[in-house]
Amino acid sequence: MPFMTASSPSLLQRLKSLSLVTQILIGLIAGIALALFAPEAAKGTAFIGKVFVSALKAVAPILVFVLVMASIANHKHGQETHIRPILFLYLLGTFAAAVVAVIASMMFPSHLVLSTDNIAVSAPGGISEVLQSLLLSVVDNPVSALMNANFIGILAWAIGMGVAIRHAGDTTREVLGDLSNGVTVIVRVVIRFAPLGIFGLVASTLATSGFGALIGYAHLLAVLLGCMLFVALVMNPLIVFWKLRRNPYPLTLQCLRESGITAFFTRSSAANIPVNLELSKRLGLHEDTYSVSIPLGATINMAGAAITITVLSLAAVHTLGIAVDIPTAILLSVVAAICACGASGVAGGSLLLIPLACSLFGIPSEIAMQVVAVGFIIGVLQDSAETALNSSTDVLFTAAACLGEEQKAQRPA
């Protein structure tokens, strides 16, 4: 039969020939369909999602350690990196996100029905405690840092070892480069399983949680997600345009599509580091720069966390009828930005830093912790959107700074 030739591609071959983003989209649609039509079967797919997230989390610490160490060890004298402008963009973006959240919360105030149930969690006592936590993370034992995915400690040791090995022989540096390439190959294999992992995560999450619990907090969620969308689609492109002086949307949308989607479903900036490193490589960015800025961004570039802290804190303020003047709102933006930068150093992330911001308005800890409880209830969407914004912004600002510096170097003197 002439139409049944050996050259006809099978369904599996056709799927393999599609881009990773398209495969992820198919996995996403399949996960939603399974949760809708066979919820019991969908619950069983949770294991696939857990395996994928665990694999990403397992490979991320060693990848960052080896990649940064190899990058610094093989860095040639006189070769430029663009870390300083990226750091500036990270801080500017986080502060801008906090300002957007303050304005949105003033325009569309949210009111909460605060629960009387107390959650037994411990929040940091002040900004100094968050900063102390970060400093202690820097001087953490290297083995402990790798085991616990303490990326501040991993970065500190990788930079220190890289600087020390720069003075070693060429053979040592070549071995380190080969080791880095080997880890990168493993990462690529893990990322190829993203469509299956996201299928499992989406199907099991929708089947077990659903979105019924979120209906009561629709207004609060609308403000939170609206702020995050505004920052992702308006504020960040404005910052990129200021840096590149050209249409920022092709780059912005590529970062959201290829980094934001996986981050949304894994809900982990650390797990998304390998995805961002791979995207940076495909964009042709400076390896010595992105190998440091991407893991650093996963720790301190927290626009989504700044929005969460600000919106939920001001929701508590509006609920209690506390008046907020402009200077206090500006101070809240600064505090939220600083807290957000320390969110990765606190177990529970941005939600447990809400009492710290609430303390600006004299809100007692008991009430602030009830606001944290609300945060946990809406966490299905809030945490996913926050991580997607945080992680996609890491690679967006890295690309903007690298491309901007390249443009500057090419301009005639």
From Swiss-Prot:
Family: Belongs to the dicarboxylate/amino acid:cation symporter (DAACS) (TC 2.A.23) family.
UniProt subcellular location: Cell inner membrane
Recorded GO CC terms: plasma membrane
PANTHER family found in the cross-reference section: PROTON/GLUTAMATE-ASPARTATE SYMPORTER (PTHR42865), SERINE_THREONINE TRANSPORTER SSTT (PTHR42865:SF8)
HAMAP family per the UniProt record, alphabetical: Ser_Thr_transp_SstT (MF_01582)
Record keywords, A-Z: Amino-acid transport, Cell inner membrane, Cell membrane, Membrane, Symport, Transmembrane, Transmembrane helix, Transport
Record's bilayer topology term: Multi-pass membrane protein
Predominant location: membrane
Signal peptide: none
InterPro entries: Na-dicarboxylate_symporter, Na:dicarbo_symporter_sf, Ser_Thr_transp_SstT
Catalysis: reaction(s): L-serine(in) + Na(+)(in) = L-serine(out) + Na(+)(out); L-threonine(in) + Na(+)(in) = L-threonine(out) + Na(+)(out)
Name of this chain's protein: Serine/threonine transporter SstT
Stretches that traverse the bilayer: 18-38, 52-72, 86-106, 119-139, 145-165, 196-216, 221-241, 292-312, 320-340, 360-380
Species whose genome carries this gene: Pseudomonas fluorescens (strain Pf0-1)
GO biological process, any: serine transport
